[in-house]
Regions:
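A structural micro-motif recognizing beta-strand termini
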Residues: 1-2, 16
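Short, Lys/Arg- and Gly-enriched loop/turn segments at beta-strand edges
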Residues: 18-31, 35-52
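Intrinsically disordered, low-complexity, charged/polar segments
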Residues: 53-61, 66-107
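Short, well-ordered loop/turn sites that connect or cap secondary structure elements
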Residues: 4-6
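Hydrophobic beta-strand signal
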Residues: 10-14
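Generic hydrophobic alpha-helical segments
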Residues: 15-18, 72
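Arginine residue identity/basic-tract feature
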Residues: 9, 26-27, 31, 67, ...
Length: 107
């Protein structure tokens, strides 16, 4: 049986080197600001502070399909990270390896 991607389906996403670097940078920036005593509340700002465990290329996380690009055979995903943040992965093809999504195995 072939599965068809659709909005709301949960898939697995494998982080690339660039994804991991981007996620780790925003989490590091948040730690550095906090260590310097800068808080968003003290600055009157509303952005999210990104807190979570370090990620690496090849790490696999659950993701929700938020857009299907049928013409390109790819999807936009909200990747659920091990922290308080998510990662928006755009135009990701189905497949194996880094920077791809795949169907989770049946348990």
């Amino acid at each position: 049986m072939t599965q068809t991607p659709s909005i709301g389906r949960i898939v697995h996403y494998t982080l690339s080197e660039q994804d991991a670097a981007q996620i780790n940078k925003r989490r590091s920036d948040a730690r550095n600001l906090n260590a310097a005593g800068v808080t968003l509340a003290s600055q009157g700002l509303g952005p999210q502070i990104h807190i979570g465990n370090k990620v690496e290329a090849g790490d696999v996380f659950p993701a929700i399909i938020v857009r299907v690009w049928e013409s390109a055979k790819s999807c936009n995903l909200q990747v659920l990270l091990d922290g308080n943040d998510t990662f928006w992965a755009c135009s990701i093809p189905e497949g194996d390896g880094l920077h791809n999504w795949s169907w989770p195995p049946r348990a």
